[in-house]
Amino acid sequence: MTLIWRHLLRPLCLVTSAPRILEMHPFLSLGTSRTSVTKLSLHTKPRMPPCDFMPERYQSLGYNRVLEIHKEHLSPVVTAYFQKPLLLHQGHMEWLFDAEGSRYLDFFSGIVTVSVGHCHPKVNAVAQKQLGRLWHTSTVFFHPPMHEYAEKLAALLPEPLKVIFLVNSGSEANELAMLMARAHSNNIDIISFRGAYHGCSPYTLGLTNVGTYKMELPGGTGCQPTMCPDVFRGPWGGSHCRDSPVQTIRKCSCAPDCCQAKDQYIEQFKDTLSTSVAKSIAGFFAEPIQGVNGVVQYPKGFLKEAFELVRARGGVCIADEVQTGFGRLGSHFWGFQTHDVLPDIVTMAKGIGNGFPMAAVITTPEIAKSLAKCLQHFNTFGGNPMACAIGSAVLEVIKEENLQENSQEVGTYMLLKFAKLRDEFEIVGDVRGKGLMIGIEMVQDKISCRPLPREEVNQIHEDCKHMGLLVGRGSIFSQTFRIAPSMCITKPEVDFAVEVFRSALTQHMERRAK
């Protein structure tokens, strides 16, 4: 079904009766009490848009047994959302179904990963076909899916970014990019923003500047943080700084063609270059929009000037497109294009395979040769036939279904809707983003902008889940809701999500008033 028809066939309905229980198949039971919305006060409750998909009957482990296995055998640092974690059973496009049959609108897409929809029919068909043909060879043999995919991906990047290294995850991709930068420059120092997340491997932890991911052990040698040019929470920034339909509530007197905040943050960047690194550096990592840090956007023109400063020091510029790439931002296919810059290296993962483990590093022939001189890079699973076939299918779906255009249209529609909530509720401090990458930052009040306490954000998060909406979390104090649905999302589903947020915020304000 085309996106146009899906927009027309999914009207938003509201019910004013008692709280609605999420849909459940009558024959499903795990022997545990199920989460309902009966805890919510009697407000107008948003009703989910319809879904024409029926999930299979759940026939696996009981919920309590899952909890026992998780506690006994899985990593203790792996935590799940919600007081009662969801046991998800099946997915279809923008929808998820739990083991009890309840349906949820997925507005986080597996941490900004399921780009074209859960179990997209075309991607499924390609995967099944390749599964029956060839699973694995390693790169010591050639196979068509790898070469077909490389040609398609290279065509989407500007010259001279044409040499592709296929790997399996964003952390792997960023580690390889670090090696490339150091091999090419013969320097060690790499700069990244405070609040940046570039991976959780021992090597990339040096680039990641979020306290949750820091260890009391040495690691990430040669990595230096610099101030994040955050126009909402940083010392400078105002109402004309961001490349977004929605600006901050802070005022500024900048002329349309001159951003004073950008100039101030560039001075801080120069200070880092003067005091914290050697005279010659290896490179600079930047996400076009910070993801884990809560969808932070930089002042217009900042990255362009920062790239010039880095190159003047002999460094290369790396764009981490793990969360921003493949049309998610709407106006452009790649996030770096929104800043009018051309990186020397681009890393990508997550949406590249719609959830299948896959990643890539793309660079210039010159930098690729520098790596080849010092390292015979090899990756057993990089360029796997299954991954490449799926990657090709994802690119085809994005083009055939106009998903980049949908991200622009529906994302802008959603940003403007959420901006109205910001104006309506004192605890919504900022709404920001571009396309289908949106952040909603919660504050105690708009004057101090102190982060809303975690326990209060947790309750709003729970209330959204009880009403059938799944969203992510981000920022240093986990005070920002991250909105990044699959790019097939429709306006009626956005209307539902906004009404869920309005209901959750209203209930929270009522709790505060008691």
Curated annotation (Swiss-Prot):
MF terms (GO), sorted A to Z: (R)-3-amino-2-methylpropionate-pyruvate transaminase activity; alanine-glyoxylate transaminase activity; beta-alanine:pyruvate transaminase activity; pyridoxal phosphate binding
Keyword Mitochondrion listed: yes
PROSITE patterns to which the protein is assigned, alphabetical: AA_TRANSFER_CLASS_3 (PS00600)
Reaction(s) this enzyme catalyzes, per UniProt: glyoxylate + L-alanine = glycine + pyruvate; (R)-3-amino-2-methylpropanoate + pyruvate = 2-methyl-3-oxopropanoate + L-alanine; 3-oxopropanoate + L-alanine = beta-alanine + pyruvate; 2-oxobutanoate + L-alanine = (2S)-2-aminobutanoate + pyruvate
Modified residues (N6-(pyridoxal phosphate)lysine): 350
PANTHER family named among the record's database cross-references: ALANINE--GLYOXYLATE AMINOTRANSFERASE 2, MITOCHONDRIAL, PTHR45688
Keywords recorded for this protein, A-Z: Acetylation, Aminotransferase, Mitochondrion, Pyridoxal phosphate, Transferase, Transit peptide
Cofactor entry: pyridoxal 5'-phosphate
This protein's record includes keyword GTP-binding: no
Localization, UniProt: Mitochondrion
Family to which this protein belongs: Belongs to the class-III pyridoxal-phosphate-dependent aminotransferase family.
Listed EC numbers: 2.6.1.44, 2.6.1.40, 2.6.1.18
Gene name of the record: AGXT2
Pfam families documented for this protein: Aminotran_3
Disulfide bonds, paired cysteine numbers: none
Residue numbers carrying N6-succinyllysine: 71, 262, 304, 417, 420
GO biological process: glycine biosynthetic process, by transamination of glyoxylate; glyoxylate catabolic process; L-alanine catabolic process, by transamination; N(omega),N(omega)-dimethyl-L-arginine catabolic process; positive regulation of nitric oxide biosynthetic process
Residue stretch of the organelle transit peptide: 1-41
Ranges annotated as spanning the membrane: none
Any one of the GO CC terms: mitochondrion
Subunit structure: Homotetramer.
Main localisation: mitochondrion
Tissue specificity field: Expressed in the convoluted tubule in the kidney and in the liver hepatocytes (at protein level).
Function summary: Multifunctional aminotransferase with a broad substrate specificity. Catalyzes the conversion of glyoxylate to glycine using alanine as the amino donor. Catalyzes metabolism of not L- but the D-isomer of D-beta-aminoisobutyric acid to generate 2-methyl-3-oxopropanoate and alanine. Catalyzes the transfer of the amino group from beta-alanine to pyruvate to yield L-alanine and 3-oxopropanoate. Can metabolize NG-monomethyl-L-arginine (NMMA), asymmetric NG,NG-dimethyl-L-arginine (ADMA) and symmetric NG,N'G-dimethyl-L-arginine (SDMA).
Top EC group: transferase
Record-given protein name: Alanine--glyoxylate aminotransferase 2, mitochondrial
Species whose genome carries this gene: Homo sapiens (Human)
